[in-house]
Amino acid sequence: MVEEVQKHSVHTLVFRSLKRTHDMFVADNGKPVPLDEESHKRKMAIKLRNEYGPVLHMPTSKENLKEKGPQNATDSYVHKQYPANQGQEVEYFVAGTHPYPPGPGVALTADTKIQRMPSESAAQSLAVALPLQTKADANRTAPSGSEYRHPGASDRPQPTAMNSIVMETGNTKNSALMAKKAPTMPKPQWHPPWKLYRVISGHLGWVRCIAVEPGNQWFVTGSADRTIKIWDLASGKLKLSLTGHISTVRGVIVSTRSPYLFSCGEDKQVKCWDLEYNKVIRHYHGHLSAVYGLDLHPTIDVLVTCSRDSTARIWDVRTKASVHTLSGHTNAVATVRCQAAEPQIITGSHDTTIRLWDLVAGKTRVTLTNHKKSVRAVVLHPRHYTFASGSPDNIKQWKFPDGSFIQNLSGHNAIINTLTVNSDGVLVSGADNGTMHLWDWRTGYNFQRVHAAVQPGSLDSESGIFACAFDQSESRLLTAEADKTIKVYREDDTATEETHPVSWKPEIIKRKRF
């Protein structure tokens, strides 16, 4: 006779299986996981060796053990040895400098002032925590004794927060962490504000470039009206107009070694003017496109020009020969500067890079790629071995000879066309929107912002600064602007540190984004 099997739902069968499984292991539910003594010892040994290895086992001589004991309450911590049961390992107990109280924050009472032997559980835990020593470790451990302390512990003073912690082991010294002084931001030097002193008009187009002659008697400007004009610096009156370029004049410079004026323009021409006869005596041919800037070497008769053809050229002033063609930029070279020290030539380009060149070899020494936008201006500090570059993203300061980055000067959010700096550390940046910012060179503090009004007869949109320069006495600042004028600024003689205080707060961390 076939026995009928009672049918159950899947849900019931699953729960019955779960119950059987639970009943099978129910005895182990409340049982703790057994402790593996060997692995626990190894774990504690590794932790102690990593964290307390240099100070846990310090070698000492038997004579020092006999002579030196804990002298006073200021001695260092000591290792005490307590005998264990026969046939077991020696157990160590680490005691503090005082027999009482047993821990921080414990009140001193009749009960806590008594120094007790460690309990069995405490001694067992300490014994487990001690590392397993190899033979090499055993050779350098201290000999058995009632107690010992580190050599020289009582001789050294208690370290303060600003002192270094030194542990002496025989004749060697292991220096531990030394507290460092918190970094401080230098306070910017106070500079008097600059105010508009004079506006000079006479050009019929944008004034694109400006230069002051070494004698500080006159200055020269070049304009989009294709003329070069020479002005009296003291009175601001026009002295002379020179014609010869057939397009915008983009750069002018006066030689300190001879009575020559050099100019360049968008007509690809580079001209040398003899100021005794007021005429062109030399042409320098070679550029394939507009010439954007030029500079003279301070110690040798060498002229350097930069162009929209992505090259800079080095010319012999006397022979008109092209000594080197500095190629490497991938876009128009907007600015060039020369100095007597290495590197002698610095160029900034619309390809966002700055290159430092070897004048003798005509090759690139360093390429700086930190800027993200076109570099239209570069200026060298007259005293420090540093320079600055201007770009629409920010102004950056660099250190020669390798172009090490110093700091960012952020805040002039415009296309920066020109930079100039004087020996007092006043950096001036002029932008295409007509704003001019003045900075402290050392700290990068922006102490003044100027936006001169557009002159009558010019459109409001014609607001832009294309060039600026200090005169030789550094008491006047001249700017060449898009409203066809030259503006002259002077320091405010009535300003003091009380009337115009430095509104500066130190930053916690100076941002040095590349």
Swiss-Prot record:
Keyword Repeat among record annotations: yes
WD repeats: 202-241, 244-283, 286-325, 328-367, 370-410, 411-449, 460-499
GO cellular component: catalytic step 2 spliceosome; fibrillar center; nuclear membrane; nuclear speck; nucleoplasm; nucleus; Prp19 complex; spliceosomal complex
Entry's Gene Ontology BP terms: mRNA splicing, via spliceosome; positive regulation of G1/S transition of mitotic cell cycle; protein localization to nucleus
Residues found modified as Phosphoserine: S119, S201, S391
Residue list for modification N-acetylmethionine: M1
SMART domains xref list: WD40
Compartment annotation: Nucleus; Nucleus speckle
Pfam family, one: WD40
SUPFAM superfamilies in alphabetical order: WD40 repeat-like
The keyword Cell inner membrane is annotated on this UniProt entry: no
Region entry Disordered, spans: 135-160
Keyword terms of this UniProt record: Acetylation, mRNA processing, mRNA splicing, Nucleus, Phosphoprotein, Repeat, Spliceosome, WD repeat
PROSITE patterns for the chain: WD_REPEATS_1, WD_REPEATS_2, WD_REPEATS_REGION
Assembly: Identified in the spliceosome C complex. Component of the PRP19-CDC5L splicing complex composed of a core complex comprising a homotetramer of PRPF19, CDC5L, PLRG1 and BCAS2, and at least three less stably associated proteins CTNNBL1, CWC15 and HSPA8. Interacts (via its WD40 repeat domain) directly with CDC5L (via its C-terminal); the interaction is required for mRNA splicing but not for spliceosome assembly. Component of the minor spliceosome, which splices U12-type introns. Within this complex, interacts with CRIPT. Also interacts directly in the complex with BCAS2 and PRPF19.
Reported function: Involved in pre-mRNA splicing as component of the spliceosome. Component of the PRP19-CDC5L complex that forms an integral part of the spliceosome and is required for activating pre-mRNA splicing. As a component of the minor spliceosome, involved in the splicing of U12-type introns in pre-mRNAs.
Similarity annotation: Belongs to the WD repeat PRL1/PRL2 family.
Protein name: Pleiotropic regulator 1
Classification of source organism: Eukaryota, Metazoa, Chordata, Craniata, Vertebrata
Gene that this sequence comes from: PLRG1
